[in-house]
């Protein structure tokens, strides 16, 4: 019983000291929070948006992760890497696999 009261007292003391620290150093904390970049982070390099109705060469290049002017060998290698990760037989989405194949076909057909 007394052990629980001691733990509760220590917890309240810690909360009190923490609140006092925050109130006294509010300006420093605000300045530190402003220095942290909000935009960007881990997802800043990802394409925002869905698929277009008719796939463009630029969209196909983004799906495969290659430049729009990539050579056929680079396109084939990129397609293989992306399909290994997203193949429906290994738990990937059939829709994404179809889009990946469509991107490969578009990139290869517009090269020749």
UniProtKB/Swiss-Prot annotation:
- Similarity section: Belongs to the TIM14 family.
Q: Chief localization class?
A: mitochondrion
Membrane-crossing residue ranges in chain numbering? 4-24
State which ranges are Mitochondrial matrix (membrane side).
25-112
What PANTHER family has UniProt attached to this entry? Answer: GEO10507P1-RELATED, PTHR12763
- What is its biological role? Probable component of the PAM complex, a complex required for the translocation of transit peptide-containing proteins from the inner membrane into the mitochondrial matrix in an ATP-dependent manner. May act as a co-chaperone that stimulate the ATP-dependent activity.
Q: Which domain of life is it from?
A: Eukaryota
Question: Keyword set for this entry?
Answer: Chaperone, Membrane, Mitochondrion, Mitochondrion inner membrane, Protein transport, Translocation, Transmembrane, Transmembrane helix, Transport
List the ranges whose topology is Mitochondrial intermembrane. 1-3
- What is the name of this protein? Mitochondrial import inner membrane translocase subunit TIM14
Q: How does it assemble?
A: Probable component of the PAM complex at least composed of a mitochondrial HSP70 protein, GrpE, tim-44, tim-16 and tim-14/dnj-21.
Give the GO terms filed under biological process for this record.
protein import into mitochondrial matrix
Q: Which GO terms describe its cellular component?
A: mitochondrion; PAM complex, Tim23 associated import motor
Asked whether the keyword Chaperone is assigned, the reply is yes
The molecular function terms of the Gene Ontology recorded here are:
ATPase activator activity
Enumerate the spans annotated as J domain.
59-112
- Which InterPro entries does the UniProt entry name for this protein? DnaJ_domain, J_dom_sf
Compartments annotated for it: namely: Mitochondrion inner membrane
The annotated topology with respect to the bilayer is: Single-pass membrane protein
